[in-house]
Each structure stands twice: as C-alpha cells, then as structure tokens.
Amino acid sequence: MDDDEDWIALSDPDISMAELDAVTNVLKSARISAGEVVDTFENDFAEYLGRRYAVAVSSATQGLMLALRALGIRPGDEIITSAYAWYQIAHAITLVGAVPVLVDIDYWSGALLTDKAAAKITPNTRAILAGNPNGHPADWNALRALASRHGLVLLEDSTEAIGSRYQGKLVGTFGDMSVFDFSQPAALVCGEGGMVVTDDPVLASELRYFRGRVMDERFSISIASRVPHQAMMSDMSAALGLAQLERLDEILARRKRVESWYLAYIQSFEGIKPAYIAPEVDEIHWMTFLVHLGTRFTRSARNQIVDDLLTAHIEAPAYCNPLHLQYFYGSLGYRKGDLPVTEKVADRALALPFHGHLDEDTVAFIVQTAKDSSVNVGAGAAIY
C-alpha cells in the first residue's frame, strides 16, 4: 500500500539533498560502520540539548536497556512507568529482568501522574521512567521532586517529543538519562537508531561500555567480567541523523505549518477533545496529529473511523494499545479496569498523518473524511 501514489502515509521523512549527499559520502569512504561520523553526531546532539554526553545506539529500546544496565538494575527491581507509552521503550524494562510498574495518566496531557507514581513506590523501586506523550512534556518539576524525595533515578523517554520545551528547557534535559528515537514517525530520522544523553561521566562511560566494542576492538578475544551488547549506530545512520539535526529547525517549521492547517480545519469537527497544552509548557512539536474523540464515541466507533480512513487510502492508526492490556503484561497480573484514564484515552484516540510533505488540500481532505465517518457512526455531540 505504501507504493500507491494515492496513499496518504502517517509519516514521510523530510529528506533533502543534504541527507543524500551525507550518506553518499559515507558510502564512498573506507568505513560505513561506527566511526568518526557517529562521534560527530553524538557531540553535535549533546551540544543541541546542552547536555555533557550523548551516546548513539541502534534503537531507543537498546538505549534504555543500556541505561538500565548502567544503573545496575537487576531482576526484581521495579521501574515505575506509564502504560500509555511507546511500547518498544517499556519493553526494555522487561528485557533486563526488571518489573514494570504501570500507573495511570493525566486525562488531558497523557503524561504520567506524579501522585499515581508516588502511590506505587515500594522498597524495590529503583527508578521512574516518564515520557513526553506524542510531544507533550510531562510535569518534570513534580517528577524530579518525587524522585529526589525517595532517592530514585529519573529516566526521561523523549522518543516522541524532540524540540518540545518545558519551562524554557528542551525535552531530553530533565532525566538523569534521557532516551531519543530516530525511527519513523519521529521528526528526526536516521532509518533506525537512538541516542541516550546524560550529564554524569560515570553513566556515560557505562553506556559506552555496555553498547559494545568499536571497530578497532572487534578483533580482540578478551572478555571482561560484564558482557556488553552490540548496539552501535553505523556511520551511515549517523550521517543521515547528523544532516537531519542540522536541518531540524527547518523540519520542525514545516511540521508546524501542517499543524496550523489541521487546527484550522478541525475547529468544525464536532465531538473531539481540543488539543491541550499545559500552562508550564512553552512549545510542543507533536509526533503525530492526534485526535481525541469525546466519550460518546465508543472504541468500536473509533475503529470504524480508522477503517473508513483506510478505505480512503489514509493511514490513521488507533493510538495506542495500552501496555497493561497486552498479553505479556496481563501475565504480570494487569487487567482491564486497572488504569481507567489510560483506557478511556486510548479507546478514543487516533493518529492522523503528520509530516512536512502534506499540503493544505490534503489536510482538508483528511479532516473532512474523518468528520464524514464520525457522522456515519452516529456518535452525536461531544462529552469529554
């Protein structure tokens, strides 16, 4: 379906000749695996955020796994996090043997609620992992105060929010370690890859150790007492990411223009929850254009709208399937009804196409198609 010229994709990377030239130069070089281009990408990304260290990795999942290992997280340790999250990130908790403790979210922002997290702290709790859902920053001051009060590590999932700002500071600057993802539908992409940032030199050293050996060390047969991963980013991916980083302001500005069209056309869409921006948030760069339907819409009505959009060749998936309702996490004892706000939000959310290649006519068509479908499902007026 992606090859259909009439298909309107959820995401479409903003690639210019700068990216093509950067990758071509690496392909013409003697090294395409991890090397100097990765080093440059790390340095420039750390400078962009104002953080001391950045460690490039093969994916955000691997990045969080390395972060947890760098902290010495062991089987049985508890990590408090949200079920309304990019599931690849939360999976990292399970993959290192730790226990994900899922808590409910704020109805308007989708962010992890500090008081809900506080109620789940036990002697086994080691860290809080909070995200910036779909680009909206969490309440980082409250989360930092909670973590400090209980001696916990604060980890930041910034996979959905590059460029967003909370009280004047960029996301990615609030966690003891913060994780970014550079795969679609993110604004900055490098195919597949991620970045972990920190200001702690010990944690940075541990991240690099657990990430695995660089090219010059791969011929050594020595094995240390702790076995590392092999989670390096290649110079090819780093070249693409570096070129994207240099154009990030331009990329985000294009997406803001598309957002303005959506906001204009969505005004006449009866029955949706308006986009929310918390008072302490200065700037938001959405990962997708997320539509929150009112409570008169059922989950099945939302799914019918998704199907109608698909029939019209519009990629607009449900957003999202909460972790506690997925089979594996059910085996940990979670059940439907445990996180009522998460379920209420997730049952009525869908993500509309959002990228810089959309024009105003296409946005108008997407919104009108969704509106027509909402009328057909007979949901009636909005109740939030």
What are the roles of these predicted feature ranges?
Residues 31-78, 92-96, 102-104, 169:
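Phosphate-binding glycine-rich loop
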Residues 99-109, 317:
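Short beta-strand->loop structural element characteristic of the AMP-binding/adenylate-forming
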Residues 1-32, 36, 353:
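N-terminal "arm"/small-domain region of PLP-dependent enzymes with the aminotransferase-like
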Residues 108-190, 195-197, 202, 351:
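Active-site phosphate-binding strand-loop segment of PLP-dependent enzymes
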Residues 96, 149-150, 269, 312:
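Helix C-cap/helix->beta junction micro-motif
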